[in-house]
């Protein structure tokens, strides 16, 4: 019985993920994209939302606060604010995120 429950639970989650990912790909409203990027439970959905956001303040918030390092890294790639990147390069809990922020600073001509 437990296997059957897990099967349906897994199928529901997969369908929910696929629906939400498709929704983000078709979303044009910056406020909705910002909300999705900050609050969706699926990291890949948040990644897709981040890829469609250009507001640096939203990206900075995500780069500093998202629970998933890959989402933070995606936001960093789009940030040009030196103070935000410096803060992340010094303080992020993940070394690969710190390195990426430092590399982004170098790409922008800061060392």
Predicted features, each with a name:
Residues 1-111:
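Alpha-helical scaffold segments
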């Amino acid at each position: 019985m437990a296997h059957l429950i897990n099967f349906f639970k897994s199928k529901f989650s997969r369908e929910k993920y696929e629906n939400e990912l498709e929704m983000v790909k078709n979303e044009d409203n910056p406020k909705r994209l910002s909300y999705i990027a900050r609050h969706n439970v699926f990291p890949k959905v948040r990644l897709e939302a981040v890829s469609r956001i250009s507001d640096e303040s939203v990206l900075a918030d995500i780069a500093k606060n998202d629970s998933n390092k890959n989402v933070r890294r995606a936001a960093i790639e789009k940030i040009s604010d030196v103070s935000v990147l410096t803060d992340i390069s010094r303080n992020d809990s993940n070394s690969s995120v710190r390195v990426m922020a430092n590399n982004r600073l170098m790409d922008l001509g800061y060392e």
